[in-house]
Each structure stands twice: as C-alpha cells, then as structure tokens.
Swiss-Prot record:
Lineage: Eukaryota, Metazoa, Ecdysozoa, Arthropoda, Hexapoda
Positions annotated as Sequence repeat: 190-199, 200-209, 210-219, 220-229, 230-239, 247-256
Keywords for this protein: Disulfide bond, Extracellular matrix, Repeat, Secreted, Signal
Protein name (Swiss-Prot/TrEMBL): Protein palisade
Location in or out of the cell: Secreted; Secreted, Extracellular space, Extracellular matrix
Amino acid sequence: MMMHSRNRSWTLTLLALGVVLATSAEDLPRSNRIAVPGEPLYYLMADAGPVVTPNEALKRTNRSLLKWWDDLFPRNNNNCCNNNNNNLLYPTAPLLPAPAVPNNCNGLQLQDLDPFKQMKLFKKLPELFPTASPCGQCGGGCGQNNYVAPAPQSPSYGGDGYGVLPNGGYIKPDTEYNGPGDGDAGYVAPAAPAYEAPAPPAPAYEAPAPPAPAYEAPAPAAPAYEAPAPAAPAYEAPTTDYSAPAPPAPAYEPPASSYTQGYSQPAQPSYVGAPPAQIVYQPIIYLSTPLASKSSTSQVEYDDQKYVTPTAPPPPPPPAPVYEAPSQNCYQPAAPPAPNYATPSCQTPIRLSLIDQPYRVAPELFEEYNYRLALASQNIL
C-alpha cells in the first residue's frame, strides 16, 4: 500500500513538472516584450515585421542600420554640450568612456561613418558665422541653460516690420477683385462670352457639304456598264452547235449485244485511238484434300505432341590448307629479325587480318603482306 502511494506521488510530481515546463515553453514565443538594442531579436524584427507594408521597407532598413551602428559605435560625451541637449535636470550618462576626438562643433561628427546619420545632422548646421568659442552651438556655456526667451513684440508699426498693424491686422477685401495672386489686383480676366465669337465660323465650314450630291452624279454611269450583259446569250450559241456530236453515242451500243453470246470477241468500235483493253477471265481452281479418317487424325495429333530432336548436320569438311609447309630441310637462310619476336622458319608464319588490328588499316596492305608471306614460304622471295 505504501509503495502504491509513493508511485502515485511520483507520478503526480512528474505530471506537474511537465505542465509547468509546457506552459513556460509556450509563454516564450508568445511574449510581447519589445527586444532592446543588443539582442538579436531586435535586429531581426527591424527587417521582418508581420504587419509591415512594402512601403515601409526602406524605413525598416534604415532603422536597423542606424540602431546597429549606434549600438556598435556609441556616442562620446564631448559632442557639443551633450549633443545640443541642455537638460540639467536629467543629464544623460555616457554610454562608454570613449577617447576624446577632435570636434569641429559644426554639427557633423566625422568620426561616425554612418551616411544616414550624416544626412540628419546636415539639417542641423549652425549659422554661417558662429561665435568664437569652443562650442559654437552652446555659446560657450556648456554647463548652463543659456536659453533666453525672446522679447515681446512691440505694438509699433513699421520699423522692424514685426509689429501689429494699426487697424488690428484686418484688411478690407476688394469685392471687385477676383484674380489669382496678390500682385494681379489690376488684372481683369476677359469675359468668357467674348471667346464664343469664333463659334459662327462653324456653319461656314458646312458649306462644302453640297458637293456631296454632285459626287452622286456618276451613279447613272452604272447602267452604261450593264450594256455588255446582252453578250451573255451570244456565248450560249456554241452550246447548240456542240449538241450535234451527241448522235454518234448510240453507234457504240451494238457491241453490248455481243456480250450476251458466249463471251465472244466484241466488235471493235470505229473510233480513233488505241483498242480497248482485253478482259482476261482467269479460272479459279480450288484444291482440297480428301477427309482423313479418325485414326489418322488421332495419329497426327499424337505425332504433334512428340518432340523430335533435330539431327545436327554433318560438320563441313575442313578447308584445304592454303599454306603447304616446305619440303626442304630446316636449314634455310634466316629471315631478318623482327622488332619484338622472331618466328622460326619451321613454324607457320603469322597471318594478319582486319580483325587483329586495333586501328583501321587499308586491306591492300594485308593482301600485300600475305602475298609476300606466301612467296617467302616457297623461297621465291
């Protein structure tokens, strides 16, 4: 009983640990915490956002480059009075103790090779002739708040040109002016109906319309082209003349009666040309064998089932030897030595053929070689 309770407690403990691990693993990717600079997820999400439109592509690229560059090369604290920020209540602490670099105090930090940041600093250039002090933007007081509020505007009119107008700044509008711009007060636009004067020439352009009926005058010329139509009956006249050769057709009908007789030679018709082709009637002879008896049929079926071993034809007689060994003794003049081997004169010389050669050789060379071998075997060469 105690063992069962211990097993149950261990099982419950393992299940609880599994649930805790599963929930913690699920919470990791579901976290909405924004990654801070320095973490890999920060730079990855800068260029891969789920709700980023294509129009934001360049902005995202610039943002990732700026953040990466700023984190890689942090600013020093000597860039013109804390980066032109005179905040005395919450001064920013230096990120890293960077070595002092020459600062020309013109808004361009030349030690930063970031093109995007350079373009942003270009818009913050100081005046053309700054005050002669180590920090131009601060006026020399780097640790003081040197902001001076501008004096209130005086109500005087004229002088500096910034005062309030004596009539309270109200300008009475000109009711008759309806032109564009401030410098065209005397401009009066021409009346729109005056531009409609060129409209009457439009009916004057319709005058060329009457020549259109004059172009219809050639229409009566069409009946003049129909005059050749009566010539069509004149072409039908040859048809009546051509009907005359029709009577000779019955002259060819007499040979038809000759076919009723015993296939006799038909009378040749009287017409110019080659005689008609003769029709040769070839008799068809059907050959048949007498019906075989049942015993012979069964014998034939039984013979078909036997396997007759074919007898091999007798081997052909061996061909007569082309080369006859010389009857002389072996003491013959020795042949010149071959490059690799020497064949004794008593043995059969080597015969070469096209099959023995790995390369293509002219057949005439083999014929000449074999011919000289034959002569040498007879001591003629």
